[in-house]
């Protein structure tokens, strides 16, 4: 009965009619395990050699800078649980090919003139260099082939010996030349970025440590903008004499007087005479790591002790 049902000659369901125009047919997605293994090898080759992630339709141009090289690869999604229409398959193929076309298109290589300027090698010349470097003169009518250690009466015999007995060495030279030329003419060859020399900062750009352009006062600078390991600078004039840069800058240290840069001393930021209009804050302390300075108890009380 099953055969009759398949043939449609018996009481089974009628044979399926071909889809009418405008109604796409539904199809089942099938998997071929042998073809999938071949496909996976090709996709892995694209990923490892060309940094091309096929299923994500993207390329990783700066893979050498990534934490884990070849650490990202997208794989096939799960099989669709339901039957899909033929139109959906065609639409998916069209969209996928449009995304892959820019990645798989052949890029222009260097012209012969540009390649010559960049050091393109000639196969025949490189072979001649190899033969010449392996033809050593020991004395009159005595020549040596260092590849085999045999001696000959003339350089022409050494040359013939190399081509006959060491043909594999000649092929290695040709392969090296082809590899070098292919690398040279590859528009996507890896190369170090061009480093532009940094312009020395002008006088107006030199700021004390902890000061950021656009933020004139240290107490207005967010702590997140301070260099790592460097304490926040105090408010102008209060404990400034005890501040030292966390990293040596090569310049002279901040000037400090015998009384901790009080009102009568020169301050590196505000000049002499104090910062007008700001009330003194007795709770603000200087750098806790500052050097303990000697204070003369007989000296006039010029600073506030806290």
Swiss-Prot record:
Q: Which GO terms describe its cellular component?
A: cytoplasm; nuclear body; nucleoplasm
| Residues recorded as bearing Phosphoserine in the entry | 109
Give the keywords, sorted: Activator, Cytoplasm, Methylation, Nucleus, Phosphoprotein, RNA-mediated gene silencing, Transcription, Transcription regulation
List the subcellular locations. Answer: Nucleus, Nucleoplasm; Cytoplasm
Major location, coarse class? nucleus
Residue positions where Omega-N-methylarginine is found in the record: 263, 270, 280
- Pfam families attached here? ARS2
GO MF terms listed in the record are: DNA binding
Residue span of region Disordered:
1-28, 251-284
Q: Which GO terms describe its biological process?
A: neuronal stem cell population maintenance; primary miRNA processing; regulation of DNA-templated transcription
Does the record bear Membrane in its keywords? Answer: no
PTM annotation (Phosphothreonine): residues: 101
Q: Entry's InterPro entries?
A: SE/Ars2, SERRATE/Ars2_C
Q: Which PANTHER family match?
A: ARSENITE-RESISTANCE PROTEIN 2, SERRATE RNA EFFECTOR MOLECULE HOMOLOG
Q: Which family does it belong to?
A: Belongs to the ARS2 family.
Its biological purpose: Acts as a mediator between the cap-binding complex (CBC) and the primary microRNAs (miRNAs) processing machinery during cell proliferation. Contributes to the stability and delivery of capped primary miRNA transcripts to the primary miRNA processing complex containing DGCR8 and DROSHA, thereby playing a role in RNA-mediated gene silencing (RNAi) by miRNAs. Binds capped RNAs (m7GpppG-capped RNA); however interaction is probably mediated via its interaction with NCBP1/CBP80 component of the CBC complex. Involved in cell cycle progression at S phase.
Q: How does this polypeptide assemble, per the annotation?
A: Interacts with CASP8AP2, ERBB4, NCBP1/CBP80 and DROSHA. Interacts with LUZP4. Interacts with NCBP2/CBP20 and NCBP3.
Indicate what this protein is called per its UniProt record. Serrate RNA effector molecule homolog
| Classification of source organism | Eukaryota, Metazoa, Chordata, Craniata, Vertebrata
Q: Name the gene behind this protein.
A: SRRT
């Amino acid at each position: 009965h099953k055969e009759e049902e398949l043939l449609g000659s018996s009481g089974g369901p009628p044979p399926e009619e071909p889809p009418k125009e405008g109604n796409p047919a539904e199809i089942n997605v099938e998997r071929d395990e042998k073809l999938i293994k071949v496909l996976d090898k090709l996709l892995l080759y694209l990923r490892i050699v060309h940094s091309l992630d096929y299923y994500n339709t993207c390329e990783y141009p700066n893979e050498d800078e990534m934490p884990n090289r070849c650490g990202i690869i997208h794989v096939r999604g799960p099989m669709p649980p339901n039957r899909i229409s033929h139109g959906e398959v065609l639409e998916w193929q069209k969209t996928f090919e449009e995304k892959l076309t820019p990645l798989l298109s052949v890029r222009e290589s260097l012209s012969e003139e540009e390649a010559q300027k960049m050091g393109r090698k000639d196969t025949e010349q490189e072979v001649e260099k190899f033969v010449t470097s392996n033809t050593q003169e020991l004395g009159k009518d005595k020549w040596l082939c260092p590849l085999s250690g045999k001696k000959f009466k003339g350089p022409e015999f050494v040359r013939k010996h190399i081509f006959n007995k060491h043909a594999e060495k000649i092929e290695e030279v040709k392969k090296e030349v082809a590899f070098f030329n292919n690398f040279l003419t590859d528009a996507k060859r890896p190369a170090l970025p061009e480093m532009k020399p940094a312009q020395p900062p002008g006088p107006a750009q030199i700021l004390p440590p902890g000061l950021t352009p656009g933020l004139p006062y240290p107490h207005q600078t967010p702590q997140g903008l301070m260099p790592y390991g460097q304490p926040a600078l105090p408010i102008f004039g209060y404990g400034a004499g005890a501040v030292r840069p966390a990293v040596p800058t090569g310049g002279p240290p901040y000037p400090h007087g015998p009384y901790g840069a009080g009102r009568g001393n020169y301050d590196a930021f505000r000049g002499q005479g104090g910062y007008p209009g700001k009330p003194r804050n007795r709770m603000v302390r200087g750098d806790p790591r500052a050097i303990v300075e000697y204070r003369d108890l007989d000296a006039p009380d010029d600073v506030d002790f806290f």
